[in-house]
Amino acid sequence: MGSLRLSPWTATASAQRGFPSAGPDPEWSGRRARPRCAPRTAPVSASASSSLGAGRLRTGMEHEWLWDCRGGGRDYAREMETAVRVVQVACTLCQRVQDSLLRSSSDAGGRVHAKLDRSPVTVADWGVQAIVSWLLSDSFRDENVSIVAEEDDETLSSSDGAALLESVVDAVNECLVEAPMYGLRSPEKQLSAHDVIQAIRKCSSVGGPKGKFWVLDPVDGTLGFVRGDQYAIALALIEDGEVVLGVLGCPNYPMKKEWLNYHQKYYRLMSNVAPPPSGSWHKGCVMYAQKGCGQAWMQPLVHDFGKLDWHHPREIQVSSIRDPVSATFCEPVEKANSSHSFTAGLAHSVGLRKQPLRVYSMVKYAAIARGDAEIFMKFARAGYKEKIWDHAAGVVIIQEAGGVVTDAGGRPLDFSRGVYLEGLDRGIIACSEALLHQRIVDAVDASWNSSTL
């Protein structure tokens, strides 16, 4: 069993920076305390400081960050530490690309492309995939790093893709040069176009029931990304068919849950009218968890505060709400991705009264893990197959935060059968609480035969 060992500086610094305090708070009351694992600080001696590797960060407070979880069986400290750092770097790239898209929307067509399924793909999708691939391979040189990821290099490698490839290479190098700020090694020289293509191609694993591999969705919710709304960078590690850790980067996730109901353009407008105090946390975070630890964690994005400082992660837990009348349920924004009419019928049958929270990407999983919503339901139309990269990281984070995620038949999601969630029973249901989850599963059984899905 692990232990929570954070320095006394944590609560004070968190409050000063605007990050939710670690102390009692009405928003967090009634949640279960499960002190089993945590990021912890460890003193770094003068003799050891010079020998710290690039992947080990010594902060200004003479501490380095370590992952302390012995509740989950195998020790994944090295993988967890690296994954959180890598996702922090990826978030920086995404924010820069999104800001560029929003500032010059008239030129966005040159940086947003449509895939065969008509979903958009951007410089950020390829850039993040290249960065994550390079950083993981560099951090685990002693291993044969295997990665399952969403994008390929076909468009970039085509005769018409030269200008787009140049933009991707520039974005990648601009971020990798800052890798040491995150406790990671940067390349000795800038990556060439060939290097970037090779990094993207390295993410060609097909998963399966054996072995260890990373699962990456470089920009989950690309439509939300190009619209200036919610999106996520999702990285998970799967070993022998089980998701063992997950990291979600949510660059636009707001401090106040009420802002999830509004498009980010209103958030940006309000931020311009009444900007938050300098150095305070108002949006953007990374959430992470390891299977079996019984805890999930959240910390603000690094760039807001400068150099990476691990003194202010805080535990996140699911909501304690059980009454459907008070529960908030999430569903995808796009009707093509899920049946809004079916979920509306289910919501009515189980007594949900609030309007659905329609959010892009795995931010829906993040909302449940943080206690900002209680239910996520997705029922794709016939013929659609869910991919593992759209769910792996979010599932383990909700589970370790105290929630439940299954298919609509109440069975665990199976990540051992390749890139798709094969054998999925009708849809996916994630809940903060087991009884609420069972009510929805029962309602699906009662309503399914009359649906048109």
Task: Give each language-model segment a name.
Residues 158-163, 258-261, 301, 343:
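Short aromatic-enriched loop/helix-cap "lid" or pocket-rim segments at secondary-structure transitions
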Residues 90, 94, 125, 136, ...:
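Residue-level signal for inorganic ion chemistry
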Residues 97-105:
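Secondary-structure edge/capping motif, primarily at the C-terminal ends of alpha-helices
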